[in-house]
Amino acid sequence: MAKSKFERTKPHVNVGTIGHVDHGKTTLTAAITTILSSKFGGEAKAYDQIDAAPEEKARGITINTAHVEYETANRHYAHVDCPGHADYVKNMITGAAQMDGAILVCSAADGPMPQTREHILLARQVGVPYIIVFLNKCDMVDDAELLELVEMEVRELLDKYEFPGDATPIVHGSAKLALEGDKGELGEQAIMKLAEALDSYIPTPERAVDGAFLMPVEDVFSISGRGTVVTGRVERGIIKVGEEIEIVGISATQKTTCTGVEMFRKLLDQGQAGDNVGILLRGTKREDVQRGQVLCKPGSVKPHTHFTAEIYVLSKEEGGRHTPFFNNYRPQFYFRTTDVTGAVELPKDKEMVMPGDNVSITVKLINPIAMEEGLRFAIREGGRTVGAGVVAKIIE
């Protein structure tokens, strides 16, 4: 069976379901694909197809994730759903499935539970920009006042983690009824309402090519008579011949000019997001550039050494550490293409971190790295991955 061609006619957005175990994330995912596929085409996925999520590896960490896709009137969505709580933690921290927005599923019968809170906090820490709420199992609650109370609790929880509680769309429904073909307002109509909320509340994300130019340095060569060539994959934006660029990270920031872009040994006028290119730099010496730095549009990214991060520490079974670590732990932090040693400061209430935990930490690197909030990294000891993390807030 040949794979059908991906038609890029509608803008593409990445979303996912989050929320407490057994509140109905997977049932909702099945209901969305079932109802939207009948309206806009696409493939319906049954509950057990989604629940049997295949294993994937991201940054050396095994994660179970189910990927489905569906269309609404205006957009094409890629949607991730994870079977277990640990999979969510790993997924959100490694950025294996980058989300432009999340659908928080909360059971109206139970109200917000510990993982509801934890997933909202994670979404805030890893930079998921928008949350829409699906209040599920509303068919099990007869009391309208109780529904109102649960909705209020959810809005307060969103506010607490700096999401706009009052402005957040909350859709009341029952994923189970919808999946069973119920056409009522808690069934199919609720799914259609959710689709409208996705379309209107989550803005179309900026495409990588529209961002400010950035390319991590992978290798540096000296070509006699021509100068220094830096190779790598353009992460975002466009670089044109003749443009000024900065070299950021490790040492003091330097300014230079791009005098040539080549790809597969051919000269180009420009390189753009996704391209593997060699960039020729004017007047830059071979020893001025090294792996771990980035080339970027001047002023767009700054080098930093001190930041807070949300991290996941691999369990022993995943090939991680066998023992806990303590305050002032000094592993290597692998950003983009290189390792930098840093010291870890634990939160006041944490004496140690066990393999398999996720925790907020503060890090001080020995060398500056070009970074922005939301940048992902791996934590390594002697080349072996022992954790994954994401920059939450830059301190300096």
From Swiss-Prot:
It is found in: Cytoplasm. Residues 81-84 are annotated as: G3. One of its GO terms (cellular component) is cytosol. Its EC number is 3.6.5.3. It catalyses: GTP + H2O = GDP + phosphate + H(+). GO terms for molecular function: GTP binding; GTPase activity; guanosine tetraphosphate binding; translation elongation factor activity. Mg(2+) binds at T26. Residues 174-176 are annotated as: G5. The keyword Metal-binding applies. The keyword Zinc-finger does not apply. Residues 19-26 are annotated as: G1. Residues 60-64 are annotated as: G2. It comes from the Bacteria. InterPro entries: EF-Tu_GTP-bd, EF-Tu_GTPase, EFTu-like_2, EFTU_2, G_TR_CS, P-loop_NTPase, Small_GTP-bd, T_Tr_GTP-bd_dom. Pfam families: GTP_EFTU, GTP_EFTU_D2, GTP_EFTU_D3. CDD domains: EF_Tu (cd01884), EFTU_II (cd03697), EFTU_III (cd03707). Residues 136-139 are annotated as: G4. Residues 10-206 form the tr-type G domain. Keywords: Cytoplasm, Elongation factor, GTP-binding, Hydrolase, Magnesium, Metal-binding, Nucleotide-binding, Protein biosynthesis. GTP hydrolase that promotes the GTP-dependent binding of aminoacyl-tRNA to the A-site of ribosomes during protein biosynthesis. Belongs to the TRAFAC class translation factor GTPase superfamily. Classic translation factor GTPase family. EF-Tu/EF-1A subfamily. Monomer. HAMAP family: EF_Tu_B. This is Elongation factor Tu. The lineage of its organism: Bacteria, Pseudomonadati, Pseudomonadota, Betaproteobacteria, Burkholderiales.
